[in-house]
Amino acid sequence: MVALRLPRGLWTAALTVMLVVLGAPVAEGRDSPQDFVVQFKGECYFYNGTQRVWSVDRYIYNQEEFLRFDSDMGEYRAVTPLGRPDADYLNGQKEALEQKRAELDTVCKHNYQIEEGTTLQRRVQPTVTISPSKAEALNHHNLLVCAVTDFYPSQVKVQWFRNGQEETAGVVSTPLIRNGDWTYQVLVMLEMNLQRGDVYTCRVEHSSLQSPILVEWRAQSESAQSKMLSGVGGFVLGLIFLGLGLFIRHRSQKGLVR
């Protein structure tokens, strides 16, 4: 299903409703509020392209919807008592009512054709990374985090596998996060007990991909970690001695020049 909010349509009716609403508290003998907000929202919903189209117009006063036009109903319906006079009036305007019903084609389907080549077909491939939540330790509980970032549209499927077998227990996902630039991200975490030789795979399916993304993460043994740390330490120590040697040589050359 695709939903588009399209602020186009029968603005004359919307303006009429707003004017009636603004005068309603006085007509009913109530004091007018100091601050008020009147909103109009036009929404179009699409199923399987334009095979099934449904539209809803919502009229809102101070954050409360009071009147609605539903294309399936074909008429205005009051949501609260405040909307009854407006519904009666607008349903009595036969020509305007027929125009409102026609907006399913003139507005919703029309705008779908405009947006189809840009917004509705826009695809951005996700970036997938795996990282443990804390330092690796064999035979200890840990949390692997599969970060799926910067993708569009929002529908995405993320699965965890351990040695080729899907893991469903201990899988937790964050809600879908909007990045604010028409892309999304989600974190899917797997609680596991780290064992030597285990291979974990995060599998991501998305409409922008011709085939799923598979990212692997392998548990390192303690000896492998020690060797890696020793190698890193040796490399850093070598850089220190190299820098010291270059410094001494530079000082010696300056002394000879003098």
Curated annotation (Swiss-Prot):
<comment type="similarity">
    <text>Belongs to the MHC class II family.</text>
</comment>
<dbReference type="InterPro" id="IPR014745">
    <property type="entry name" value="MHC_II_a/b_N"/>
</dbReference>
<keyword id="KW-0391">Immunity</keyword>
<feature type="signal peptide">
    <location>
        <begin position="1"/>
        <end position="31"/>
    </location>
</feature>
<dbReference type="InterPro" id="IPR011162">
    <property type="entry name" value="MHC_I/II-like_Ag-recog"/>
</dbReference>
<dbReference type="GO" id="GO:0042605">
    <property type="term" value="F:peptide antigen binding"/>
</dbReference>
<dbReference type="Pfam" id="PF00969">
    <property type="entry name" value="MHC_II_beta"/>
</dbReference>
<dbReference type="InterPro" id="IPR007110">
    <property type="entry name" value="Ig-like_dom"/>
</dbReference>
<dbReference type="InterPro" id="IPR013783">
    <property type="entry name" value="Ig-like_fold"/>
</dbReference>
<feature type="disulfide bond">
    <location>
        <begin position="146"/>
        <end position="202"/>
    </location>
</feature>
<dbReference type="InterPro" id="IPR003006">
    <property type="entry name" value="Ig/MHC_CS"/>
</dbReference>
<feature type="disulfide bond">
    <location>
        <begin position="44"/>
        <end position="108"/>
    </location>
</feature>
<keyword id="KW-0472">Membrane</keyword>
<dbReference type="GO" id="GO:0050870">
    <property type="term" value="P:positive regulation of T cell activation"/>
</dbReference>
<feature type="region of interest" description="Connecting peptide">
    <location>
        <begin position="218"/>
        <end position="227"/>
    </location>
</feature>
<feature type="region of interest" description="Beta-1">
    <location>
        <begin position="32"/>
        <end position="123"/>
    </location>
</feature>
<feature type="transmembrane region" description="Helical">
    <location>
        <begin position="228"/>
        <end position="248"/>
    </location>
</feature>
<protein>
    <recommendedName>
        <fullName>SLA class II histocompatibility antigen, DQ haplotype D beta chain</fullName>
    </recommendedName>
</protein>
<dbReference type="InterPro" id="IPR000353">
    <property type="entry name" value="MHC_II_b_N"/>
</dbReference>
<dbReference type="GO" id="GO:0002503">
    <property type="term" value="P:peptide antigen assembly with MHC class II protein complex"/>
</dbReference>
<keyword id="KW-0491">MHC II</keyword>
<dbReference type="GO" id="GO:0031902">
    <property type="term" value="C:late endosome membrane"/>
</dbReference>
<feature type="region of interest" description="Beta-2">
    <location>
        <begin position="124"/>
        <end position="217"/>
    </location>
</feature>
<feature type="topological domain" description="Cytoplasmic">
    <location>
        <begin position="249"/>
        <end position="258"/>
    </location>
</feature>
<dbReference type="InterPro" id="IPR036179">
    <property type="entry name" value="Ig-like_dom_sf"/>
</dbReference>
<keyword id="KW-1133">Transmembrane helix</keyword>
<dbReference type="InterPro" id="IPR003597">
    <property type="entry name" value="Ig_C1-set"/>
</dbReference>
<keyword id="KW-1015">Disulfide bond</keyword>
<dbReference type="InterPro" id="IPR050160">
    <property type="entry name" value="MHC/Immunoglobulin"/>
</dbReference>
<keyword id="KW-1064">Adaptive immunity</keyword>
<dbReference type="GO" id="GO:0050778">
    <property type="term" value="P:positive regulation of immune response"/>
</dbReference>
<dbReference type="GO" id="GO:0005765">
    <property type="term" value="C:lysosomal membrane"/>
</dbReference>
<feature type="glycosylation site" description="N-linked (GlcNAc...) asparagine">
    <location>
        <position position="48"/>
    </location>
</feature>
<feature type="topological domain" description="Extracellular">
    <location>
        <begin position="32"/>
        <end position="227"/>
    </location>
</feature>
<dbReference type="GO" id="GO:0023026">
    <property type="term" value="F:MHC class II protein complex binding"/>
</dbReference>
<keyword id="KW-0325">Glycoprotein</keyword>
<dbReference type="GO" id="GO:0002250">
    <property type="term" value="P:adaptive immune response"/>
</dbReference>
<feature type="domain" description="Ig-like C1-type">
    <location>
        <begin position="126"/>
        <end position="230"/>
    </location>
</feature>
<dbReference type="GO" id="GO:0019886">
    <property type="term" value="P:antigen processing and presentation of exogenous peptide antigen via MHC class II"/>
</dbReference>
<dbReference type="Pfam" id="PF07654">
    <property type="entry name" value="C1-set"/>
</dbReference>
<keyword id="KW-0812">Transmembrane</keyword>
<keyword id="KW-0732">Signal</keyword>
